[in-house]
Amino acid sequence: MKLTPGCFLWYLYMDKIYCLLSLRNVKALMVYFHLLDVHHRNTLNDVLFFHFLQHVTNLNKSQIGMIFDLLDWTAVGEIGFDQFYVLICILLAHQDHLEDHFMYRHSRPVFELLDLDGEMNIGAANFQNYRFLFNIKKQELRDLFHDFDITGDRLLNYKEFKLYTIFCTDKSIDRKKRRKDREAAREREKEKGKDKEKYLHLKKIYSSMLSHRSIL
């Protein structure tokens, strides 16, 4: 899932610590929402929602329909600004590769969002259907239920889900640290290479000067 370059959402900034928009960005998003709301009902129906997501993402028709059903909590065929705001935060978190951190910071809302039946647990099927929203790979999904389904009922309650988000965040931080260390190591190797080039260049100049003096 990717945002369309140059679309309105491309210019919104998400705080990387709390995974929320600033008040200024929320106000801008609210104005944008009202522009999309051509019927002036303070809601977006499925048609408006489809055209919006088709314009700002590369999601297909089936995925857009699934997201609408996920956000239409009261099953009235419309979503309000609150649901719209949640969606935008998810899209921006995905764009900034903050999916794990977003789930950790907002574990309760995400859990309630994926708990489609309202039974205070999430099944593997729900995760499978919506894993594209949080960039969860198939193997990660299998590992999730193998490692965190403590009760063994193939369902995650909130505590199990929270443990999963903590683990993912720690893993993500460790992955970023290792990537940063590798980049630093490459930079050091580049500097060593530059120093060696300088040394060889100076050595060449010095040898040339000695040769010139011997001729004289």
Curated annotation (Swiss-Prot):
Q: Which GO terms describe its biological process?
A: flagellated sperm motility; sperm capacitation; spermatogenesis
Q: Which residues form the EF-hand domain?
A: 59-94, 100-135, 136-171
Q: Which residues form a coiled coil?
A: none
Report keywords, A-Z: Calcium, Calmodulin-binding, Cell projection, Cilium, Cytoplasm, Differentiation, Flagellum, Metal-binding, Repeat, Spermatogenesis
Q: What is its main location?
A: cytoplasm
Keyword Repeat tagged:
yes
Which protein are we looking at? EF-hand calcium-binding domain-containing protein 9
Species name = Mus musculus
Its lineage opens with:
Eukaryota, Metazoa, Chordata, Craniata, Vertebrata
Q: Which gene produces this protein?
A: Efcab9
